[in-house]
Regions:
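Acidic, metal/ion-coordinating pockets
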Residues: 25-349, 493
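Short amphipathic alpha-helical segments with coiled-coil-like heptad repeat character
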Residues: 2, 284, 426-428
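Non-catalytic nucleic-acid-binding interfaces of large nucleic-acid enzymes and RNP effectors
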Residues: 14
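Bacterial N-terminal signal peptides that target proteins for export
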Residues: 2-11
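C-terminal motif of bacterial Sec signal peptides marking the signal peptidase cleavage site
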Residues: 19-22
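Catalytic centers of hydrolytic enzymes
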Residues: 32-38, 42, 47-49, 53-56, ...
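A short acidic-Thr-Gly-centered motif at the start of a beta-strand
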Residues: 24-25, 483
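Compositionally biased, intrinsically disordered/low-complexity regions enriched for serine, proline
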Residues: 3, 25-28, 514, 594
Length: 673
């Protein structure tokens, strides 16, 4: 990390900040900063539970340290995805958390972290809505001894009025953030010393397809598979204009777009937005003075500087997820509220790395509540890491950049587990389809030595002596972490034509998309240079896809040279996730935009939760801790049955060697050979 006591701190106090920012050989015609805002920001605590829990205490100390240096100049925000369903999230329901939370309930430990960090406003991320608006409301609003969020959640481009769970939490735009704890609004005012800062947020319209937003309406609506950036900018601009009309000349946008490309595009399309805090993409921006964690690589400059639609300076900032970094931007404004780029200070601003091994690293004093809640959650999780289901001798590749772009050994393994599980009840099931976005983390270790210039070493899970778990053993905690959503499994028939359409959708939009397929019982090739399938707002095909070149189910050739061969109406029995099949309450098709038919039209549908209960787990060979008929149950039982004594031993391969999913820009087509 950057040293906490750079030379300028040894000779200066917070009161001298404007004098200091004038130093360093700056052209004398550059105006002095009339006000310098210290913006502290976090987001995306949605990846590794271990990383987040081991980092949050040290981050709390950094926040307190920096806030104490500039107590009348600091704004602390999050750009969303502050939690995600999974072990850490669920552990807050344990009665041992009652004394700390007031009332135990899932997700509330994460909210307690944010409260202790002093977050003053947050964007709504997609993961806030993964369990629906009722659960979201349960986390942010008071409930008996539970105090709820101590800050407002913001999203200007969301209409909350049609959702009964959260409509009552919505306040008019433009109130005082300090008086809006546990409420929802489009934009708010944060009083920072003598200054008023307008804070507005926006949530990606794609949320309607990738999470469970209930009756929430996102603007502009998704008319295709792409976000209408111009329409989104126009929507946000209306809110920004409201802020400036109220006499506020400093504006921060919390943009949870899941794509830094979109956030950069918004920067040049909007007027009077000074700072955009990006969210959802886990992108690490940094400057030359930042010392990154071992193995991490910068994705660009902190801050990203450009001009807005009126030619005024604006910036985009973002840091990596899971409390690994605290973003800190010292924003010098002139008397008119315009940023002064010549006075940006890269020694103070940037990505400040936290420590996973030393809570007080850098001489900071951590928040007592953060460390207490952290320790209580870790105690709950520790018990789960000793409950073992199978073994692996290899790193199971479940990282976002892999499972959303290519076949991986973990993608194959969990797809195979679902297929094996479905066949316990129905031996005629032939194929398994799931989305890469449903795999939330790897199972194994990523080892990188400080200062290393070579790739990190990937290994099977290391031993945990505290939990009495041996190296290579796969625990309940690992399964719950990597398959956090624990979707239910459905079985039904699809035709040859429908199967090609589904796979065309999976590869229609590339580049770390949650829709990217992981499959079992079949193999296919695709050419990303060919025409992509497009869908209308009702998920009907408007442009036929030409990317799927070969497809084989067992020995049955389904697609050859891009064309369905044989009887196009012949059927294949498929197991898939209920999320993909039935989607969300606001999407006409399936989750991640999959063009499944409406539930009533599924042929020979079997819900494995119901079927497994009726058959007393279908004769599965072991007992798991997960819901019957779920993907966690399938994976635990499959691993115990197939790899309980002999470890799984298939290494992950690069795209050029992948066999189930062959990317023809990386290799030749051997699917039908």
């Amino acid at each position: 990390m950057k040293p906490l006591f750079p030379r300028r701190f040894l000779i200066a106090s917070a009161a001298a900040v404007m004098v200091l920012t004038a130093c360093g050989g700056i052209d004398p015609v550059v105006p002095e900063a009339a006000f310098t805002l210290q913006l502290l920001h976090v987001s995306d605590a949605d990846g590794s539970d271990s990383t987040a829990l081991n980092s949050v205490a040290n981050l709390s100390g950094l926040v307190q340290k920096f806030r104490a240096q500039y107590p009348q100049q600091t704004l602390t925000v999050s750009s969303g995805d502050n939690y995600i369903p999974g072990p850490r999230f669920n552990a807050a329901y344990d009665p041992s958390l009652r004394a700390l939370l007031g009332k135990e309930e899932v997700g509330r430990a994460d909210m307690a972290f944010l409260n202790a960090l002093g977050i003053q406003a947050s964007a709504i991320g997609n993961h806030e809505l993964d369990l629906g608006t009722r659960q979201f409301a349960s986390i942010i609003k008071p409930d008996g001894a539970w105090g709820g969020a101590r800050f407002p959640y913001l999203s200007y481009n969301v209409d909350f009025s049609a959702d009964s769970e959260v409509a009552g939490l919505k306040l008019a735009n433009g109130g005082n953030a300090a008086e809006q704890a546990g409420k929802l609004t489009g934009w708010t005012v944060v009083h920072v010393g003598s200054q008023k800062i307008g804070v507005i947020a926006a949530s990606s319209p794609v949320f309607a397809n990738i999470t469970s937003p209930g009756g929430l309406v996102f603007k502009p609506a998704m008319a295709s598979g792409e976000v209408d950036v111009n329409g989104l900018a126009a929507e946000i601009q209306r809110g920004v204009d409201e802020i400036t009309a109220a006499g506020i000349n400093k504006v921060v946008l919390l943009a949870h777009m899941q794509s830094l490309t979109i956030e950069k595009a918004l920067a040049s399309r909007l007027k009077n937005v000074d700072i955009i805090v990006a969210g959802g993409s886990n992108t690490l921006l940094s400057d030359a003075n930042d010392v990154l964690r071992a193995g991490d690589k910068s994705a660009g400059d902190y801050p990203y500087q450009t001009q807005d639609a009126a030619g005024q300076p604006t910036v985009v900032v973002n840091v990596d997820a899971d409390y690994k970094y605290l973003g800190r931007f010292m924003a010098p404004f002139d008397a008119k509220g315009v940023l002064i780029p010549q006075r940006f200070d890269s020694q103070l601003s940037g990505a400040w790395a936290t420590s996973e091994t030393d809570d007080s690293a850098g001489g900071v004093t951590v928040s007592g509540l953060v460390s207490q809640v952290r320790d209580a959650i870790k105690a709950v999780l520790k018990a789960k890491d000793g409950n073992v289901f199978g073994k692996t001798a290899e790193f199971l590749e479940g990282r976002r950049a892999a499972v959303r772009n290519e076949e991986t050994n973990f993608g194959n393994l969990t797809a195979d587990a679902n297929l094996w599980y479905a066949r316990l009840l129905d031996p005629t099931v032939q194929i398994s389809l799931k989305n890469g976005g449903g795999i939330r983390s790897e199972i194994g270790e990523v080892l990188a030595m400080p200062g290393a210039t070579t790739a990190a070493v990937l290994t099977a899970p290391k031993a945990n002596a505290e939990a009495n778990r041996l190296a290579g053993e796969i625990s309940q905690l690992a399964v719950e972490t990597s398959l956090k959503f624990n979707n239910k499994l459905w079985v039904f028939d699809v035709t040859a034509t429908q199967l090609k359409t589904l796979l065309e959708h999976g590869v229609a939009v590339l580049g770390s998309q949650g829709r990217f397929p992981q499959v079992g019982g079949m193999s296919f090739s695709y050419d990303p240079a060919r025409t992509a399938q497009t869908l209308d707002a009702n998920f009907a095909v408007t442009t036929a896809g030409e990317r799927i070149r070969s497809l084989k189910v067992g020995t049955d050739v389904v697609v050859q040279n891009g064309v369905v061969v044989g009887n196009a109406q012949r059927t294949f029995r498929m197991v898939t996730l209920n999320f993909l099949a039935e989607g969300t309450s606001t999407a006409a098709g399936g989750g991640d935009g999959y063009p499944f038919p409406a539930t009533a039209n599924f042929v020979n549908l079997v819900n494995l939760e119901t079927a497994m209960n009726a058959a007393t787990a279908g004769g599965a060979a072991s007992t798991s801790t997960a819901l019957l008929g779920s993907e966690q149950d399938a994976f635990m039982k499959y691993m115990k049955s197939q790899f309980g004594s002999t470890a799984f031993g298939v290494k992950d391969t690069p795209p050029a060697q992948d066999l189930r999913i062959q990317n023809l820009s990386q290799r030749s087509d051997t699917v039908l050979n």
